[in-house]
């Protein structure tokens, strides 16, 4: 049944993602365009800027390094951060670095017991955020590569900040809502 659902949804979902990443209107545009515009305004992003491969690559690396540093320090400082009713101390330097690298690169390798080693804050703000932004970065890389092949004579391969915003807002968040409703309807544990 699972494979059948994947096969049936592959083409419509692929078409939807293609339209989103090309900036075309989709059924969620009416709701999400104001959110998207607000994000661009707050971050001072020119959504129409077409980045060359060097600027696009630099944006990916800068974004990933900033994510890495933030997640690393969340792990180290979790003993002082909120949402830590068990008073779990910060992780060791090597474990914090390993976890940060792992989640930023979307490998999500866990060398610890999450329930007893990480606070709620670290899990929610650190890891869950990375569970959205690291696949979004992967989607950005994929679409930049595709554009690079198809835009032979163009100077740019898209805008990283636009791509990551759209991949999170239009693809990953809606998919997570739909799939979480499916899981809730099946009685999956909420805690």
Question: Over which residues does each language-model region extend?
Answer:
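Functionally constrained cores in energy, signaling, and assembly domains
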Residues: 12, 100, 104-111, 131, ...
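N-terminal alpha-helical transmembrane segments of multi-pass membrane transport
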Residues: 1-98, 142-143, 150-158, 162-191
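Pore domain of cation channels
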Residues: 5, 115-147
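P-loop potassium selectivity filter motif centered on the GYG triad
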Residues: 82-127, 189-191
